[in-house]
């Protein structure tokens, strides 16, 4: 008699799925030989297979638990990846506008480059013209260099003359200082002389005023009469007052008079007598 096949499950090596193991069934054919002890041998084999199945079931349970944990972790990663995909989609939308702006900028740059091409050609012509002008200036620079050398020699000669002039100027400065001192002393003397002149002028004008005042005095010439006279006189801003007294003898042979004049500069006086002899 034949025994039915026995199905067992065995753990298969990871086939590339993250942290997930595969389990597949395996068929074990029992010993179907009809010989003494054959059934017994088949039962023993079944018992052995049962134990193996229990062991495999325990291992499968551990693998299932591990797979459950891994699936949970993968779920979190899938959610994170989904958010990253959404963020990327938004960033791609933003970049689309920037790309359009960049495309416009590139087109504008192309147009500007086209305009600059003409300017570059004009600059190239200007550079060529500058080279020609530089060539002409080279000769002028050589001429100027010779002129500078000549000027340097002339300056050296002038330096000697300037030094000589500086010595002369220093000597003149010393002489000028001496002359200034002499002129200052002379000025002081002139000032003193001017003061004396002013004083003499004032006194002279005062004397003339006194004389004018004295000349204005008039006395009584009658015999035996004593008379008093007053007068005033002036000369170039100076004014004087005068007074006098006179006497004529009874026989009219003698006349006497005394007078005095005064102003701010001083006092003048006079006295006189006259006699008749026949």
Curated annotation (Swiss-Prot):
Residues 186-224 are annotated as: Outer membrane translocation of the passenger domain. Residues 1-29 form the signal peptide. Participates in bacterial attachment to several surfaces, including various extracellular matrix (ECM) components and a hydrophobic abiotic surface. Involved in adhesion to host epithelial cells and is required for full virulence in mice. Also implicated in the resistance to porcine serum. GO terms for cellular component: cell outer membrane; cell surface. Disruption phenotype: Deletion mutant shows a significant decrease in the attachment to an abiotic surface and in the ability to bind collagen, hyaluronic acid and fetuin. Deletion leads to decreased adhesion to host cells, but it does not affect later stages of cellular infection. Splenic infection is significantly reduced in mice. This is Autotransporter adhesin BtaF. The signal peptide, cleaved at the inner membrane, guides the autotransporter protein to the periplasmic space. Then, insertion of the C-terminal translocator domain in the outer membrane forms a hydrophilic pore for the translocation of the passenger domain to the bacterial cell surface. Homotrimer. The gene is btaF. Transmembrane segments: none annotated. The keyword Transmembrane applies. It comes from Brucella suis biovar 1 (strain 1330).
């Amino acid at each position: 008699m034949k025994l039915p096949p026995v199905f067992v499950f065995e753990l298969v090596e990871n086939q590339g799925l993250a942290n997930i193991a595969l389990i597949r069934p395996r068929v074990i054919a029992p010993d179907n030989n009809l010989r003494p002890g054959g059934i017994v041998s088949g039962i023993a084999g079944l018992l052995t297979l049962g134990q193996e199945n229990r062991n495999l079931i325990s291992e499968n349970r551990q693998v299932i638990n591990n797979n459950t944990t891994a699936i949970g972790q993968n779920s979190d990663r899938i959610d994170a990846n989904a958010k990253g995909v959404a963020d990327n989609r938004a960033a791609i939308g933003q970049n689309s506008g920037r790309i359009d702006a960049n495309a416009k900028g590139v087109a504008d740059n192309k147009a500007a480059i086209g305009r600059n091409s003409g300017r570059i050609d004009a600059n190239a012509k200007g550079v060529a013209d500058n080279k020609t002008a530089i060539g002409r200036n080279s000769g002028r620079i050589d001429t100027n260099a010779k002129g500078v050398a000549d000027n340097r020699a002339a300056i050296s000669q002038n330096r000697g003359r300037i030094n000589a002039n500086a010595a002369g100027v220093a000597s003149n400065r010393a002489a000028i200082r001496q002359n200034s001192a002499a002129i200052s002393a002379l000025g002081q003397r002139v000032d003193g002389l001017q003061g004396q002149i002013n004083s003499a002028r004032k006194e002279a004008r005062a004397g003339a005023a006194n004389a004018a005042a004295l000349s204005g005095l008039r006395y009584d010439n009658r015999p035996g009469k004593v008379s008093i006279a007053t007068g005033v006189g002036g000369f170039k801003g100076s004014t004087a007052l005068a007074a006098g007294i006179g006497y004529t003898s009874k026989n009219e042979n003698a006349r006497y008079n005394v007078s005095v004049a005064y102003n701010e500069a001083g006092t003048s006086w006079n006295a006189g007598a006259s006699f008749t002899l026949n």
